[in-house]
């Protein structure tokens, strides 16, 4: 034992065995102490060794614990426990095994074999469970592979591939991967590249969410099904996890050592293992230190070139360009396979293939029209992401929302429950009252309470029954999916008897139960729980994500849109043509007959100041979003210089503020359904109009970072007072002198606002007084303004040059100032009504 050189884990096991024997009062360290000490190690090799031979470690641990309890105990013994004869023999055998295997250290697996080869109770226990020395040795070689114990901490090199990777073929065999629909050409290209002699390393390049990882999962499913050429038959496809390989690597060289062990395992498999690395660009620089150029990418280059490592990678176009293309030696070892975004039709096919999985997971039914809506609406409205990922997410969230409603108490039950609680509180208050009225009320209340309790019980029972019926359907679908998976596995394994029993016996039986259960779940017409995901549910999720009303027009909204001119006319006076044009544009968009590749409507409002151009934009925002501030306002007077154009779309690369985005593009990205007001557009530099050309024609704009911002759901409104006061021909001549023909031609309409007549001014006075009245209502004050007073305000508040804007100032001065003085002097009190009339001399208004 002089040359005994244990590993760290071996030393820990011996120390733990000594402590266990000492604390239990055992005079000797027996083999059972050693076995338990090894099984207690969290990341030790003993438990995996037993699992490999089909023995449950917990069962062995429990039986060993019972053996330990039967050992003799010595009380009052101050000496330290010594190794027993059997333990010493096991350690000696372990040392001999280490020498035989050309290992430099004695490790816990050597000791495990030494215990099994002895004649102790532990040896009988292990052999009795099927862990004989021969079986353990075979498992030991399988776990260790080609590795030798050359360090004091060798355990991390065992089962390195299993530790730092996921077996996709095993997951596919167990039915854990989602079905892959389509993508046959891409999978065929991957198979072709993998079948090459050298540089057999395909890399899938495409935008995020187009299905690169799904293609690799599809390859794993084909390998399991045997639907691949002979060169890939029975191969293992593993997904390497570089994150877990880097995690916990505290010392320099530890990551490289882990990676080398994994690569050696792959190399010694003689082409049996195909490796997949998602986010392939992460290999560049992974594990590199400041002075060293040895990263994961450089470590795998030689194996890639020689064809010893068959690697499938997946990364996005930007990251491939940024990381892989910089290293020409690494890039030439890969064969690019471009993965494009599927069409809407292909996406519908993919969703149909995934439908069953999502129905089973959420326990709801998903209609085919919902799948079509998910593909179409995501393509139309969610422009920053890619199909099929965004469509799958829509279906998933819509089903999740419906499941949450099923699991929550219906609103109807909540309302009755609150009513019952209120009646019970009222009953407790009336019980002690002696007067006749209270007694009569108590009697009536108790009758109502009994009725409501009965109704609550009935509703709760109905809800529970409907919920149970839905859950039964969900459980049967889960059973059916499990049985189908078992049937496929039995066919692959050649167990035709089991496959026939499942296919022609148990599966039809469950299908029959499911057919009977589905009508039960839908039996009543007045169901409390909705269990079907339809197009409206998908549209609601789109609206929640983007703020765009993508759902069908509700009855209330239809009526609101039809009387849109009246609603806008309450705030914008005397501009019927402009109001009508804007209303038509909004109706076209909501009815779905507008061009989907252009903005909802784009207008140039012309006319003198103060006639309602900006007010119409505010009124439109208020009508659509119930908030007049819900619009993007760009004051074009701030963009009078050539270089200020960059503020709209963001600074170009290399300039300060490049990472901040543009004021216009960022605002529309955050709120894609909005009114965009370009106020006083004639004051902007002419280059600004060139930027707006793409917005008006194609409904999109590219910002300084190269991202496309979608303007198709916006209403761009440009206001200007060019040629104000002139005839229509003069106004249009002024417009043509400032704006280029291609700019004017892209607008939906150029609207010239008319001047205001006296009657319209009185209506504007009413609007201003109504706004003042809302502010006074907080103090319960009312104004009674006479018609002469309104005409006086209209006459004195209008200026042909300034339009109706001075009216607001006049209302504040003529009424607001007097009212403020009266309030401060205590002449007016809350709840008073103040008449407003013209003074006899006609010079001012008088209150009170």
Swiss-Prot record:
Superkingdom assignment: Bacteria
| Stretches assigned to the Clp R domain | 1-146
- Give the primary localization class: cytoplasm
Where along this sequence does the record place binding of ATP 2?
607-614
Q: Which GO terms describe its biological process?
A: cellular response to heat; protein refolding
State the residue spans of region: NBD2.
557-755
Q: InterPro entries from the entry?
A: AAA+_ATPase, ATPase_AAA_core, Chaperonin_ClpB, Clp_ATPase_C, Clp_N_dom_sf, Clp_R_dom, ClpA/B, ClpA/B_CS1
What name does the UniProt record give this protein?
Answer: Chaperone protein ClpB
């Amino acid at each position: 034992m002089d040359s005994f050189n244990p590993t760290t884990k071996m030393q820990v096991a011996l120390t733990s065995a000594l402590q266990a024997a000492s604390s239990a009062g055992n005079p000797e360290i027996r083999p059972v102490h050693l076995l338990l000490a090894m099984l207690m190690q969290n990341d030790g090799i003993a438990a995996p060794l037993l699992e490999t031979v089909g023995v449950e470690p917990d069962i062995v641990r429990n039986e060993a614990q019972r053996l330990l309890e039967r050992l003799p105990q010595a009380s009052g013994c101050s000496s330290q426990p010594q190794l027993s004869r059997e333990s010493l023999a096991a350690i000696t055998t372990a040392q001999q095994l280490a020498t035989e295997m050309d290992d430099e250290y004695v490790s816990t697996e050597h000791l495990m074999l030494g215990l099994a080869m002895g004649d102790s109770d532990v040896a009988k226990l292990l052999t009795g469970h099927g862990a004989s020395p021969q079986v353990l040795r075979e498992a030991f070689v399988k776990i260790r592979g080609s590795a030798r114990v050359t360090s004091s901490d060798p355990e991390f090199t065992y089962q390195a591939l299993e530790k730092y990777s996921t077996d996709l073929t095993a997951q596919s065999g167990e039915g854990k991967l989602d079905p892959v629909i389509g993508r046959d050409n891409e999978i065929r290209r991957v198979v072709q590249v993998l079948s090459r002699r050298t540089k057999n390393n395909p890399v899938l390049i495409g935008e995020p969410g187009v299905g690169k990882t799904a293609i690799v999962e599809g390859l794993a499913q084909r390998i399991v099904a045997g639907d691949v050429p002979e060169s890939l038959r029975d191969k293992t496809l593993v997904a390497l996890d570089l994150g877990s390989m880097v995690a916990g690597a505290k010392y320099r060289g530890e990551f490289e050592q882990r990676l080398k062990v994994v690569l050696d395992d792959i190399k010694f498999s003689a082409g049996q293992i195909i490796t997949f690395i998602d986010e392939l660009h992460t290999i560049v620089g992974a594990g590199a230190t400041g002075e060293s150029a040895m990263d994961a990418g450089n470590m795998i280059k030689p194996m890639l070139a020689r064809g010893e490592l068959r690697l499938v990678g997946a990364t996005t176009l930007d990251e491939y360009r940024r990381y892989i293309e910089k290293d020409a030696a690494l890039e030439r070892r890969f064969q690019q396979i471009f993965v494009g975004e599927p069409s809407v039709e292909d996406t519908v096919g993919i969703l149909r293939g995934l439908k069953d999985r999502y129905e089973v997971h959420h326990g709801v039914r998903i209609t085919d029209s919902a799948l079509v809506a998910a593909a179409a609406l995501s393509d139309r409205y969610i422009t920053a992401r890619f199909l099929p990922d965004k469509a799958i997410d829509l279906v998933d969230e819509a089903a999740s929302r419906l499941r949450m409603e099923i699991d929550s108490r219906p609103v109807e039950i909540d309302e009755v429950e609150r009513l019952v609680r209120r009646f019970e509180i009222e009953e407790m208050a009336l019980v002690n009252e002696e007067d006749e009225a209270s007694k009569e009320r108590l009697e009536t209340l108790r009758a109502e309470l009994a009725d409501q309790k009965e109704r609550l019980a009935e509703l709760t029972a109905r809800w529970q029954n409907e919920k149970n019926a839905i859950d039964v359907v969900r459980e049967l679908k889960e059973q059916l999916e499990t049985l189908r998976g078992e049937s496929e596995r039995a066919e692959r394994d050649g167990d035709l008897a089991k496959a026939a029993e499942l296919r022609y016996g148990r599966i039809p039986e469950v299908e029959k139960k499911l057919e009977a259960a589905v009508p039960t779940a839908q039996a009543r017409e007045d169901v409390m729980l909705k269990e079907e995901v339809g197009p409206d549910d998908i549209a609601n999720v789109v609206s929640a994500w983007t703020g765009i009303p993508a759902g069908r027009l509700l009855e209330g909204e239809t009526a609101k849109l039809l009387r849109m001119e009246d609603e806008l006319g309450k705030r914008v006076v005397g501009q019927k043509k402009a109001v009508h044009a804007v209303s038509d544009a909004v109706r076209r968009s909501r009815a779905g007959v507008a061009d989907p590749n252009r903005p909802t409507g784009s207008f140039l409002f012309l006319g003198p100041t103060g006639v309602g151009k900006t007010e119409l934009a505010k009124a439109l925002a208020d009508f659509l979003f119930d908030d007049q501030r819900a619009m993007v306002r760009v004051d074009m007077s701030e963009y009078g210089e050539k270089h200020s154009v960059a503020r709209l779309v963001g600074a170009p690369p290399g300039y300060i503020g490049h990472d901040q985005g543009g004021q216009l593009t960022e605002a529309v990205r955050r709120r894609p359904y909005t009114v965009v007001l370009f106020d006083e557009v004639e004051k902007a530099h002419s280059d600004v109009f060139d930027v707006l050309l793409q917005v008006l024609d194609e409904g999109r704009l590219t910002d300084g970072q190269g991202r496309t911002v979608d303007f198709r759901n916006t209403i761009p409104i440009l206001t200007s007072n060019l040629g104000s006061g002139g005839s229509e021909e003069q106004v249009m001549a002024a417009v043509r002198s400032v704006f280029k023909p291609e700019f004017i031609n892209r607008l939906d309409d150029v609207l010239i606002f008319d001047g205001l007549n006296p009657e319209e001014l009185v209506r504007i006075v009413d609007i201003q007084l109504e706004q003042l009245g809302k502010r006074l209502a907080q103090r319960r004050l009312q104004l009674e303004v006479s018609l002469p007073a309104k005409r006086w305000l209209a006459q004195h508040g209008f200026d042909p040059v300034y339009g109706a804007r001075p009216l607001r100032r006049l209302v504040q001065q003529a009424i607001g100032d007097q009212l403020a003085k009266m309030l401060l002097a205590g002449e007016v009190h809350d709840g008073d009504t103040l008449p407003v009339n013209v003074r006899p001399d006609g010079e001012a208004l008088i209150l009170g």
